[in-house]
Amino acid sequence: MAKKSKVIKELKRQKLVEQYADIRRELKAKGDWEALSKLPRDSAPARLHNRCTVTGRPRGYMRKFKLSRIAFRELAHKGRIPGVKKASW
């Protein structure tokens, strides 16, 4: 389980990215790099990091399910992810 503070910080970053998305797009189109650099650092989408919705783990993230590999495995074995079953051939 990730620290709550890290998960909250990531949510704060997501809100900032959404808030400044239009402004950033306009400034990039104009080529106004000075104004762009004066925006908050956390408003840049490059600073976002995907986190597992269950555990908050930042590594081993599966985009399609929004889960880390560990949480995915546990939930898949329990049959809680629709359409996912263990492979056998």
From Swiss-Prot:
InterPro entries: Ribosomal_uS14, Ribosomal_uS14_bac/plastid, Ribosomal_uS14_CS, Ribosomal_uS14_sf. One of its GO terms (molecular function) is rRNA binding. Keywords: Ribonucleoprotein, Ribosomal protein, RNA-binding, rRNA-binding. PROSITE patterns: RIBOSOMAL_S14 (PS00527). GO terms for cellular component: cytoplasm; small ribosomal subunit. It comes from the Bacteria. Pfam families: Ribosomal_S14. One of its GO terms (biological process) is translation. Binds 16S rRNA, required for the assembly of 30S particles and may also be responsible for determining the conformation of the 16S rRNA at the A site. Part of the 30S ribosomal subunit. Contacts proteins S3 and S10. Belongs to the universal ribosomal protein uS14 family. This is Small ribosomal subunit protein uS14A. It comes from Bacillus velezensis (strain DSM 23117 / BGSC 10A6 / LMG 26770 / FZB42).
